[in-house]
């Protein structure tokens, strides 16, 4: 393929001026062979297995970063859902497993490890229940462990008993991490239709259908897309879509090149490239800024959902043309705390929780990194989760909720997390109760569109 000098300079500009980077290289590790009735033996086998697979992950990614000159921001690990592999232990407290995961993460030098997870869309086994009950203590006693719970699928419906329980778990997690503004909640996500090959945290886990060891890559390029859209001269919306497609193609090619080289050097299988546009707190590296570049005065105003749908579709089309290994979440992320444009939109009053929910209908992944008042009830949190799960179930898409109930905060306060997690303005929730609805429990049946056979 003929490459012009202008294209080389364009790529250099993307990296140096427009925040183009590989957001994450995530190694997925199968832990099914580690199961053991004795939890101490199990923990040691989990630690040993992770160390054996991932001991060179950080060094290898840094070598490739230096080779290509492309920043790789995070190195991560995902493991088989712990609720599955720890079931044989028959222990009620699985927080020691999280500590074993954290020890392996610290010693390998990676940034986060995901997979302290349970899949409970149709019901909870004793192992699932033990894991879910252990989440608050697990996240409070570790630094790098991330947790996720899948409570709904299009095929199974919504497990409302699990949804109700997660409201309490999120509140407990916030309370146990009160000293860090409820930071534990930033490492906990509740899913509908969770993908098994997601490289992004906090929802990454190594699915049952995955190979023994795999490399999945997530790219990040909102700043590049924003610059490309703003450079257009009075474009029609079709022209904007075409511009985003071409930009996404270039971003995806770069990500695949890096991912395949990492996998080759580590003798692991290359899994997927996640096309998600993942913002950072850096100025200009914002999904909201792209929507405003299309002509919206402020993200969240009328037309925002349509603009986001255009963006999400164009990214997928451009990325799918560039790679035959697209997977994970693959869309535009709208995490409030990690996006300067979103934060400003909330502060100026154009972006509400209800509008964010509408936006999740057309992008990935859901209500992400939102802060709500510290006195928000568990039932209200569960109701927010239930709404988002319904969107995912009906539309056959992945949706999720990552909500922080920072203790002691009220509407308008800013909650600081630091690093890539940024800071979040505390947003209002509805004052009317959902308590009776959530307390009914049971299951919301799968929709008619689940009957596809």
UniProtKB/Swiss-Prot annotation:
Which residues pair up as cystines?
none
Give the matching InterPro entries: UPF0210
Q: Name one Pfam family in it.
A: DUF711
Superkingdom of origin organism: Bacteria
UniProt record similarity statement: Belongs to the UPF0210 family.
Q: How does it assemble?
A: Homodimer.
Supply the HAMAP family for this chain. UPF0210
Q: What is this protein called?
A: UPF0210 protein Pcar_2119
User: What organism, scientifically named, is this protein from?
Assistant: Syntrophotalea carbinolica (strain DSM 2380 / NBRC 103641 / GraBd1)
Q: What is the lineage of its organism?
A: Bacteria, Pseudomonadati, Thermodesulfobacteriota, Desulfuromonadia, Desulfuromonadales
């Amino acid at each position: 393929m003929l490459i012009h000098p202008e294209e080389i300079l364009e790529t250099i500009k993307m990296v140096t001026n427009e925040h183009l980077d590989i957001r994450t290289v995530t190694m997925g590790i199968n832990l099914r062979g580690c199961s053991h009735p004795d939890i101490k033996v199990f923990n040691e086998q989990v630690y040993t297995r992770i160390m054996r697979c991932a001991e060179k992950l950080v060094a290898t990614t840094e070598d490739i970063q230096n080779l290509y000159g492309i920043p790789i921001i995070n190195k991560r690990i995902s493991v088989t859902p712990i609720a599955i592999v720890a079931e044989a232990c028959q222990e009620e407290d699985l927080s020691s497993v999280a500590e074993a995961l954290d020890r392996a993460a610290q010693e390998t030098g990676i940034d986060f490890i995901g997979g302290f997870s349970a899949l409970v869309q149709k019901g909870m086994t004793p192992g699932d229940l033990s894991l879910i009950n252990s989440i608050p203590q697990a996240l409070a006693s570790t630094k790098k462990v991330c947790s996720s719970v899948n409570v709904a699928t299009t095929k199974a419906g919504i497990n409302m008993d699990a949804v109700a329980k997660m409201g309490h778990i999120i509140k407990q997690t916030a309370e146990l991490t009160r000293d860090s503004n409820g930071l534990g909640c930033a490492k906990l996500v509740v899913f509908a239709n969770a993908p098994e090959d997601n490289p992004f945290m906090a929802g990454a886990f190594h699915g049952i259908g995955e190979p023994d060891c795999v490399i999945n890559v997530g790219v990040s390029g909102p700043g590049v897309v924003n610059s490309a859209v703003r450079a257009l001269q009075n474009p029609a919306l079709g022209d904007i879509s075409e511009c985003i497609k071409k930009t996404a193609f270039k971003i995806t090619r770069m990500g695949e090149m890096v991912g395949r080289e990492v996998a080759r050097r580590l003798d692991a299988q290359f899994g997927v490239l996640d096309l998600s546009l993942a913002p950072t707190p850096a100025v200009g590296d914002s999904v909201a800024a792209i929507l405003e570049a299309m002509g919206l005065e402020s993200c969240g105003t009328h037309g925002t959902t349509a603009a986001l749908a255009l963006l999400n579709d164009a990214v997928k089309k451009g990325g799918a043309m560039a790679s035959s290994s697209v997977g994970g979440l693959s869309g535009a992320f709208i995490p409030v705390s990690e996006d300067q444009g979103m934060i400003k939109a909330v502060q100026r009053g154009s972006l509400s929780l209800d509008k964010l929910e509408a936006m999740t209908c057309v992008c990935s992944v859901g209500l992400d990194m939102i802060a709500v008042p510290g006195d928000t009830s568990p039932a209200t949190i569960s109701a927010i989760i239930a709404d988002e799960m319904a969107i995912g179930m009906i539309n056959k898409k992945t949706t999720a909720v990552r909500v922080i109930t920072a203790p002691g905060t009220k509407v308008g306060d800013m909650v600081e997390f630091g690093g890539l997690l940024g800071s979040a303005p505390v947003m209002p929730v509805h004052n009317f109760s959902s308590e009776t609805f959530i307390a009914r429990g049971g299951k919301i049946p799968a929709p008619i569109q689940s009957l596809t056979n």
